[in-house]
Amino acid sequence: MPPRPSSGELWGIHLMPPRILVECLLPNGMIVTLECLREATLVTIKHELFREARKYPLHQLLQDETSYIFVSVTQEAEREEFFDETRRLCDLRLFQPFLKVIEPVGNREEKILNREIGFVIGMPVCEFDMVKDPEVQDFRRNILNVCKEAVDLRDLNSPHSRAMYVYPPNVESSPELPKHIYNKLDKGQIIVVIWVIVSPNNDKQKYTLKINHDCVPEQVIAEAIRKKTRSMLLSSEQLKLCVLEYQGKYILKVCGCDEYFLEKYPLSQYKYIRSCIMLGRMPNLMLMAKESLYSQLPIDSFTMPSYSRRISTATPYMNGETSTKSLWVINSALRIKILCATYVNVNIRDIDKIYVRTGIYHGGEPLCDNVNTQRVPCSNPRWNEWLNYDIYIPDLPRAARLCLSICSVKGRKGAKEEHCPLAWGNINLFDYTDTLVSGKMALNLWPVPHGLEDLLNPIGVTGSNPNKETPCLELEFDWFSSVVKFPDMSVIEEHANWSVSREAGFSYSHTGLSNRLARDNELRENDKEQLRALCTRDPLSEITEQEKDFLWSHRHYCVTIPEILPKLLLSVKWNSRDEVAQMYCLVKDWPPIKPEQAMELLDCNYPDPMVRSFAVRCLEKYLTDDKLSQYLIQLVQVLKYEQYLDNLLVRFLLKKALTNQRIGHFFFWHLKSEMHNKTVSQRFGLLLESYCRACGMYLKHLNRQVEAMEKLINLTDILKQEKKDETQKVQMKFLVEQMRQPDFMDALQGFLSPLNPAHQLGNLRLEECRIMSSAKRPLWLNWENPDIMSELLFQNNEIIFKNGDDLRQDMLTLQIIRIMENIWQNQGLDLRMLPYGCLSIGDCVGLIEVVRNSHTIMQIQCKGGLKGALQFNSHTLHQWLKDKNKGEIYDAAIDLFTRSCAGYCVATFILGIGDRHNSNIMVKDDGQLFHIDFGHFLDHKKKKFGYKRERVPFVLTQDFLIVISKGAQEYTKTREFERFQEMCYKAYLAIRQHANLFINLFSMMLGSGMPELQSFDDIAYIRKTLALDKTEQEALEYFTKQMNDAHHGGWTTKMDWIFHTIKQHALN
């Protein structure tokens, strides 16, 4: 199921001509050719068509024009009925300019909804109707129950519940205020400005209140009422009654954006207020009538689609058999027959023979030895060969999969053979109904991904490639007299009890399994200590076979250390039903673990459905909405590791997305951004469909956002392809002229920002928009903030639109920096990081927030003349900061620079962020330093002539040290430098304490396909930088050495910067 083939207005054409001839077929058989404006609406075209039709024969057979709609063929080769006649001709995405007039039939509302859903997800909904896979059809029906529950939940308390869905409180996970933030308050009190609109002309009045930081919004409103009524000279009783009457009728809104304080959280728990406290700013809140907000909220209706009433096509028993048998009663080894392959395209002159490599895997772990077919000539890829595996069918775990690949062999006699995978595929050995696969099957394979070093891809997607022109492998599984099912929990428990009692009867000296038998009765203190030590090991730390045996033999005691579960699961022999059954019984009653630990159980190492369900239940119990938002990128990615479409993780995320619109917004875009990826387009498309059916009126907002992004993609495609050789002036003229077209103005104004749905993008400020100079022609766009109080937050919103760069790596890096910042803040370290907004919205398409009042180091150095630009004057940056921050604010600017520089030194070192030059390090006017453009991380640094260009662990140049030491020549001997070092040390150790979290977050992203995050070897770089094999003292010594290397090797960075500056000046 591929996404839309192009972003053009007609097939193969980016923009329609200003006037275009459209062929219109009328119900009476007449064809009328109309000359239409490209931006003409369908209602205009229809009116003109019926006026023209009167000049043709048989016009008397036509009914009134309102009885008809247009239909045509779109670029997806789909027949689409156009019910919405406000749509413009250029936005219909027609294959050819041809329209047919018909009388509509069927359910009009459902057709309109299906079209809207198809547009926003980038795939016609009817494609799902055509899929014959019963799992797909059952999922579509069953997931509607989650949708219905979520919609009912939103309407539970009528308007308030609906408001909570649309404007969920944007709060920190904990109400506790970190000490260093509390110290910024005046005896625990905060000054808040409350604004009130007092006339239809939007005249404003303000009240300044000094209140306790832990007041709830209702108390703030009460205090505002008291202040407003002070001039009325009310008695204390009258005042009390007045407060009681009006307190519940008002709510607080953040001035300048769509954030509301709707719940009784302490004021300082709201992120806006906490940010104001940290930055030393006065919060501005608007008092508005609750009813005015409630009256704006749409009442969502949820209608079950027609496919929900269809009968399931899944047959409970294969081949018409009326009986089933348990997997565990079969007494034979697994075997699979490889029949033949088709569409295997190889160069016969380069390849000697081909063969099929196969393996039975559980996650990334083989359950038995891999087995290969015989080698055959490329010209005749037929095997008809049974492959026997060293595993009994009853020992197959629930998540077992067959992994296979067609491989080529190259090499002459006596020379070393070269084996290369040509295509790969995976098959679940149990389907979604717990049934063991049987019979013949054809599997279309997938192309080999970049960076795959092995012949098999066990953590890749299961199932057939929808592209039928790829290599196809035909194979056959054993048939059985009855349908074979994986046993249910009662059978598993019974078997577990039997195996435990059998184990208890073994003599330890007479069995080969003695080192794995349960020994909880003889647990010594040093055994307990060893278990605790194993528990604290990081997720990438290898567990030896002896340690696995030790863990398993003390499995019952492990329940008292709940967080050891991931290590215990890795010690299970998943090819032994005895151990799997016992593990299931342990997991069934395992105490809950923290969400950050539970997330580890969702990566590719833990494929078992019961284990993953346990992890999701922990998330349901303990994961706050704030933390869920923080980890949403990873939780969407690990959906790829789920065996089946319907699972607890899908249901958990969907329910959260449908009860919290902010979560739903990013849930939508994280799924939508991967719809071009064929390995997940069906899974993600189905999930997007179910979300869009139940998200209510927010679908209209998503429609507007997608429409705007489509317009921008089209514009940048033209600039990169058709206008690439034009001058900047000609390109800008084209951009402005195009944006002034009515369809572009409609699409690009008055919608919610995809970067932050609390921010509205109003009118485009065309005079402030520009095309940036880099090769991919990013657009720097500027919108007005239409909020009535915009001057109290920001009056314009600047966003960079990029088409051609993969922003997923930037998005991940910024998320990790944001999490680092949270850890530091909670530990009392205020390092003032600036993880600006960044969102990938499609295949190498995305948005980046522009940070206000910021400049690149290169721009600042160039202001210092030729010496500054060529790095000969290291005082340029310090002088610029002094000029920007004169008098008393100078010390604050240096402090802010020092803190942020320390934070980014530690973050860029730990994450191995490369390509650090003076164009991607920026400084704000107030002194805050931050990094941008994270195209290289985990030590994948740029190379020149085969050598890494960057020779220092992180950027700490003389320019920075001069600023930190306030201009001192011997900067390393100053107290300011010592303070800077102390900040770095504390920051490094704080992140080291949370090493497991960061390793888990990167591990969960392995399925993303990012070029620099392909394997656990890439993530091992974080183990190295955090020195996890060392003691804390040794780790600190290691980091100290890196820091010394950074500032002593700063001259090499300066040389890189000189060449970068010269190159940029040459390009411009």
Swiss-Prot record:
Disruption outcome: Lethal. Embryonic fibroblasts cells are resistant to oncogenic transformation induced by oncogenic receptor tyrosine kinases (RTKs), are unable to differentiate into adipocytes and deficient in cellular signaling in response to various growth factors. Defective responsiveness to insulin led to reduced somatic growth, hyperinsulinemia, glucose intolerance, hyperphagia and increased adiposity.
Pathway participation: Phospholipid metabolism; phosphatidylinositol phosphate biosynthesis
Record-level GO BP terms: actin cytoskeleton organization; adipose tissue development; angiogenesis; autosome genomic imprinting; cardiac muscle cell contraction; cellular response to glucose stimulus; cellular response to hydrostatic pressure; energy homeostasis
GO molecular function: 1-phosphatidylinositol-3-kinase activity; 1-phosphatidylinositol-4,5-bisphosphate 3-kinase activity; ATP binding; insulin receptor substrate binding; protein kinase activator activity; protein serine kinase activity; protein serine/threonine kinase activity
InterPro entries given in the database record: ARM-type_fold, C2_domain_sf, Kinase-like_dom_sf, PI3/4_kinase_cat_dom, PI3/4_kinase_cat_sf, PI3/4_kinase_CS, PI3K-type_C2_dom, PI3K_ABD
UniProt key word Nucleotide-binding: yes
EC number in record: 2.7.1.137, 2.7.1.153, 2.7.11.1
Notes concerning its domains: The PI3K-ABD domain and the PI3K-RBD domain interact with the PI3K/PI4K kinase domain. The C2 PI3K-type domain may facilitate the recruitment to the plasma membrane. The inhibitory interactions with PIK3R1 are mediated by the PI3K-ABD domain and the C2 PI3K-type domain with the iSH2 (inter-SH2) region of PIK3R1, and the C2 PI3K-type domain, the PI3K helical domain, and the PI3K/PI4K kinase domain with the nSH2 (N-terminal SH2) region of PIK3R1.
Subunit text: Heterodimer of a catalytic subunit PIK3CA and a p85 regulatory subunit (PIK3R1, PIK3R2 or PIK3R3). Interacts with IRS1 in nuclear extracts. Interacts with RUFY3. Interacts with RASD2. Interacts with APPL1. Interacts with HRAS and KRAS. Interaction with HRAS/KRAS is required for PI3K pathway signaling and cell proliferation stimulated by EGF and FGF2. Interacts with FAM83B; activates the PI3K/AKT signaling cascade.
Physiological role: Phosphoinositide-3-kinase (PI3K) phosphorylates phosphatidylinositol (PI) and its phosphorylated derivatives at position 3 of the inositol ring to produce 3-phosphoinositides. Uses ATP and PtdIns(4,5)P2 (phosphatidylinositol 4,5-bisphosphate) to generate phosphatidylinositol 3,4,5-trisphosphate (PIP3). PIP3 plays a key role by recruiting PH domain-containing proteins to the membrane, including AKT1 and PDPK1, activating signaling cascades involved in cell growth, survival, proliferation, motility and morphology. Participates in cellular signaling in response to various growth factors.
Name this polypeptide is given: Phosphatidylinositol 4,5-bisphosphate 3-kinase catalytic subunit alpha isoform
Organism: Mus musculus (Mouse)
Gene expressing this chain: Pik3ca
